[in-house]
UniProtKB/Swiss-Prot annotation:
The keyword Membrane applies. This is Hemin import ATP-binding protein HmuV. Residues 12-248 form the ABC transporter domain. The keyword Cytoplasm does not apply. The gene is hmuV. ATP binds at residues 44-51. SUPFAM superfamilies: P-loop containing nucleoside triphosphate hydrolases. Part of the ABC transporter complex HmuTUV involved in hemin import. Responsible for energy coupling to the transport system. InterPro entries: AAA+_ATPase, ABC_transporter-like_ATP-bd, ABC_transporter-like_CS, P-loop_NTPase. Belongs to the ABC transporter superfamily. Heme (hemin) importer (TC 3.A.1.14.5) family. It is an enzyme of class 7 (translocase). Keywords: ATP-binding, Cell inner membrane, Cell membrane, Membrane, Nucleotide-binding, Translocase, Transport. Its EC number is 7.6.2.-. It comes from Yersinia pestis. It is found in: Cell inner membrane.
Length: 266
């Protein structure tokens, strides 16, 4: 009899996460997993707890109750440098007070590596994010969309390795300031990277149609609870969205992919 060994899937696992500020529950009993090689979108109305959940999943906040494990190890027990090489976070707002050039900002992502193979990493991620022409510009004078592209390049540089290992990339509204071309380019790039490497991407998105087009799974957060989780077809239906967003909307099918697309009624 042949012993068919099964390769374990690299996971980030959260179990019964709670997070309270004073007497208010911002996150309430959330359990989930994110596997390398998939793209996950977190959606939900304003105040649902999306950014707070992202900070819990990345170790920037410690839960009031519950645990979060990355590759089987509690996030709180990771060494900072090892964690920085395994997961990266692009926050919603990234203002700088000093006159750093774009290339210097992106190079900050290489801090955990001590200069190892920086040039190759920087050239690759700047090309991927359409930042080469911005390299010598002062980061502070860029448009909001240009700054988002630079921050994406920085976190990609942080996770770049010559021999890719399982890694997790978290992004908080990475397309909020981008024009249509760069929204499409960015999400195509992120999805492509999850197919080519053992990389997981988890991003908070407000645009439900972008989530439908590019995410493998969608997690709907409302009032601090994970109220729906599944494929775009499973989560993005009119009944569920109307219940939690309280908007007068409809759901149709994309003419090419047949994925759900959401529209507001007049």
């Amino acid at each position: 009899m042949v012993d068919m060994a099964v390769t374990p899937v690299a996971l980030l696992e959260a179990s019964h996460l709670h997070y309270h500020v004073q007497q208010q529950a911002l996150i309430n009993d959330v359990s989930l997993h994110i596997a390398s090689g998939e793209m996950v979108a977190i959606i939900g109305p304003n105040g649902a707890g999306k950014s707070t959940l992202l900070r819990l999943l990345t170790g920037y906040l410690s839960p009031s109750h519950g645990e979060c494990h990355l590759l089987g190890q509690n996030l709180n027990s990771w060494q900072p440098k090892a964690l920085a090489r395994t997961r990266a976070v692009m926050r919603q707002y990234s203002e700088l007070a000093f006159p750093f050039s774009v290339s210097e900002v992106i190079q900050m992502g290489r801090a955990p590596y001590g200069g190892s193979q920086d040039r190759q990493a920087l050239q690759q991620v700047m090309a991927q994010t359409d930042c080469l022409a911005l390299a010598q510009r002062d980061y502070r004078v860029l448009s909001g969309g240009e700054q988002q592209r630079v921050q994406l390049a920085r976190v990609l540089a942080q996770l770049w390795q010559p021999q890719p290992t399982p890694r997790w990339l978290f992004l908080d509204e990475p397309t909020s300031a981008l024009d249509l071309y760069h929204q499409q380019h960015t999400l195509r790039l992120l999805r492509q990277l999850t197919r080519q490497e053992p990389l997981a991407v988890c991003c908070v998105l407000h645009d439900l149609n972008l989530a439908a087009l590019y995410a493998d799974r969608i997690m709907l957060l409302a009032q601090g609870k994970l109220v729906a989780c599944g494929t775009p077809e499973e989560v993005l239906n009119a009944e569920t969205l109307t219940q939690w967003y309280q908007a007068d909307l409809g759901v149709s099918r994309h003419p090419e992919s047949a994925l759900p697309q959401i529209y507001l009624r007049q």
